[in-house]
């Protein structure tokens, strides 16, 4: 489950129309949310509030079972009003629980209007951990409608302090460009003098006005190819990885995502397949293989969403039209049979014409458009049901053949509180035990 400050950053991105799904860093989020979720350890309780539409603060207490109580203080400020912000009482669980990502790359790039030109938003975030007094901070500044600068910093106590250096400081710089067709990130990490470059390109989208317009502004399928390059100036170490992502909606409206990731330096290849079979269920699998060690692993997982007892459960399958209505529904008002000028000239002569073939081709074109429109309506109906469904809880489960562990996590809402609890079960035949267990409670106003 997203923490309070992570949720605020998500609200800021949605308000400023910044799509994180179009960045290489988040290309594997659909599978990672189910197969790599983090189980809370110990007990953690956080209380957050909003003093204004621009200022937010949070305080949390945590006990990891070592007899010591830790805490943190956080502050968040933005120049843009977060109109989509909701408290823990009113927030939908879809907004705070990581699950399948409905990737919808826009068909055009965003541009500022004259009124928005002077309103390039930015945010500031800071957190202090107690009693260690370690600190972390983040700043995001939107430079243009499709470019932003992100700065992250961490200051922690040095585990081996010296008279001249008792703290460790690390800064990270991100220059991100996000367009409908591609995205790019230039990264620098000060701790190891590490330089990085990420790039993601989307195939199959076109805004050429001469092309036939799409049936709907939503993309039924998207193929993306991305790569990242790293170079450590201090240790002279390179890094390289590339990922292919295909996300689509089937004819029944169920979204699916397939990814293929490769790291040639480490010799690792991994594939993931995720599909949302209905509004309540998502299935996911991942296969890893290493060419150097010949080791492999298979990980499978799922998440199950639940409604309240008194809530109206939406039907996961849209109601189809009656057969007679489907046969008669042809949008002729949008498509007319038009003969070119040269055909009109030929009609003056007495040459035989094959008008039946022309009419058949036009009819098939109309039927194809009709089928496409029905598919898009089905997809939109399925998507809206996911966004508007009154979920009350979600259960996540994954297991790995190599590690012999089963991870369980339950996330939900009780009154005005957001709850997250889970455990990790070790199924070793010699010594089966519980490796980890925790509970996290959040409240915001």
From Swiss-Prot:
The lineage of its organism: Eukaryota, Fungi, Dikarya, Ascomycota, Saccharomycotina. This is Mitochondrial distribution and morphology protein 10. Lacks alpha-helical transmembrane segments, suggesting that it resides in the membrane via beta-sheet conformations similar to those predicted for other outer membrane proteins and porin. Its main location: mitochondrion. GO terms for biological process: establishment of mitochondrion localization; mitochondrial genome maintenance; mitochondrial outer membrane translocase complex assembly; mitochondrion-endoplasmic reticulum membrane tethering; phospholipid transport; protein insertion into mitochondrial outer membrane. Belongs to the MDM10 family. Pfam families: MDM10. One of its GO terms (cellular component) is SAM complex. It is a multi-pass membrane protein. Coiled coil: none annotated. Component of the ERMES/MDM complex, which serves as a molecular tether to connect the endoplasmic reticulum and mitochondria. Components of this complex are involved in the control of mitochondrial shape and protein biogenesis and may function in phospholipid exchange. MDM10 is involved in the late assembly steps of the general translocase of the mitochondrial outer membrane (TOM complex). Functions in the TOM40-specific route of the assembly of outer membrane beta-barrel proteins, including the association of TOM40 with the receptor TOM22 and small TOM proteins. InterPro entries: Mdm10 (IPR027539). Keywords: Membrane, Mitochondrion, Mitochondrion outer membrane, Transmembrane, Transmembrane beta strand. Component of the ER-mitochondria encounter structure (ERMES) or MDM complex, composed of MMM1, MDM10, MDM12 and MDM34. Associates with the mitochondrial outer membrane sorting assembly machinery SAM(core) complex. It comes from Komagataella phaffii (strain GS115 / ATCC 20864). It is found in: Mitochondrion outer membrane. The keyword rRNA-binding does not apply.
């Amino acid at each position: 489950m997203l923490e309070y400050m992570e949720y605020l950053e998500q609200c800021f991105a949605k308000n400023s129309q910044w799509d994180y799904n179009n960045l290489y860093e988040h290309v594997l989020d659909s599978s990672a949310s189910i197969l790599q979720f983090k189980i809370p350890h110990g007990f953690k309780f956080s209380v957050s509030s909003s003093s204004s539409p621009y200022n937010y603060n949070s305080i949390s207490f945590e006990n990891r079972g070592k007899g010591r109580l830790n805490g943190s203080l956080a502050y968040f400020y933005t120049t843009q009003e977060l109109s989509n912000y909701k408290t823990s009482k009113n927030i939908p669980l879809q907004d705070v629980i990581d699950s399948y990502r409905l990737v919808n790359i826009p068909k055009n790039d965003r541009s500022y209007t004259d009124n928005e030109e002077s309103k390039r938003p930015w945010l500031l975030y800071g957190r202090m951990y107690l009693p260690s007094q370690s600190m972390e901070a983040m700043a995001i500044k939107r430079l243009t409608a499709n470019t932003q600068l992100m700065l992250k910093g961490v200051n922690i106590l040095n585990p081996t302090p010296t008279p001249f250096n008792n703290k460790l400081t690390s800064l990270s710089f991100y220059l991100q460009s996000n367009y409908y067709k591609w995205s790019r990130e230039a990264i620098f990490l000060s701790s190891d003098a590490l330089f990085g470059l990420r790039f993601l390109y989307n195939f199959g989208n076109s805004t050429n006005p001469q092309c036939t317009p799409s049936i709907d502004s939503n993309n039924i399928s998207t193929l993306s190819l991305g790569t990242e390059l790293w170079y450590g100036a201090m240790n002279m170490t390179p890094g390289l990885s590339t990922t292919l992502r295909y996300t689509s909606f089937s004819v029944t409206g169920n979204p699916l995502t397939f990814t293929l990731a490769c790291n040639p330096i480490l010799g690792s290849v991994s594939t993931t397949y995720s599909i949302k079979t209905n509004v309540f269920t998502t299935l996911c699998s991942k296969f890893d293989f290493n060419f150097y060690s010949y080791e492999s692993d298979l990980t499978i997982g799922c998440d199950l969403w639940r409604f309240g007892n008194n809530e109206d459960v939406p039907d996961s399958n849209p109601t189809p039209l009656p057969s007679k209505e489907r046969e008669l529904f042809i949008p002729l008002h949008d498509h007319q049979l038009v003969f070119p000028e040269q055909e009109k000239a030929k009609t003056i002569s007495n040459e035989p014409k094959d008008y039946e073939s022309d009419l058949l081709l036009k009819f098939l074109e109309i039927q194809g458009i009709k089928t496409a429109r029905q598919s898009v309506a089905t997809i939109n109906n399925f998507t809206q049901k996911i966004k508007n469904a009154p979920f009350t809880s979600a259960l996540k489960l994954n297991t790995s053949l190599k590690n012999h562990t089963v991870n369980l996590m339950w996330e939900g809402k009780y009154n005005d509180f957001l709850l997250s609890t889970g455990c990790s079960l070790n199924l070793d035949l010699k010594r089966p035990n519980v490796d980890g267990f925790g509970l996290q409670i959040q409240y915001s106003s």
